[in-house]
Design a protein with these regions (language model features):
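FIC/Doc superfamily catalytic core
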Residues: 1-169
């Protein structure tokens, strides 16, 4: 397995070659130990854990999705979020070149500063976006409750509340 600019590119065009498969279990165990132990700042730990997971690249497919999912789970695991609701995929996708370059700089230099600066910026931006989304949902809830909450049916308001408590997409 290797990572190239385009799917199907030969290994000669690889931009990253993950460790050989016989090292993967040890590297994943090391990553889990890192997540569970230590006193580092939670965001630093989440950022480094994401990089390390991407570097180990333990699966043939889905590493990016799982690596991005790891971020809110690390923060949640360390009890800094009530729910694992911080999703950076949108930001990483919108800034893909910068994201990949920041990860690659760690590979080249062993220095996490550029990666962590990008990571912190992505967290801050995504938190702002999440806050806006939550505010919009509350506003929508208030509008709908005000519009339909005074209806004649005693079931309408509980129905509206149920939709907002357990949305189905």
């Amino acid at each position: 397995v290797w990572i190239a600019e385009k799917m199907g590119d030969p290994i000669e065009k690889a931009i990253y070659i993950p460790p050989e498969h016989h090292f993967v279990n040890d590297y994943v165990e090391n990553l889990l130990s890192y997540i569970e132990n230590g006193k580092e700042n939670t965001l630093v730990k989440a950022g480094i854990a994401h990089y390390q997971f991407e570097a180990v690249h333990p699966f043939e497919d889905g590493n990016g999705r799982i690596g991005r999912l790891l971020i809110p789970l690390v923060i949640y695991y360390r009890r800094k979020l009530d729910l694992p609701i911080l999703y950076l995929s949108g930001y990483f996708d919108a800034h893909r070149d910068e994201y990949l370059n920041a990860l690659h700089r760690v590979d080249e230099t062993g220095n996490y500063e550029i990666w962590l600066a990008f990571f912190f910026k992505s967290v801050a931006e995504q938190l702002r976006e999440t806050q806006k989304l939550v505010e919009n949902i509350y506003s929508l809830y208030d509008d709908i409750r005000d519009k339909f909450g005074t209806g004649k049916s005693p079931y309408l308001l509980p129905f509206v509340e149920a939709i907002f408590k357990v949305p189905i997409f």
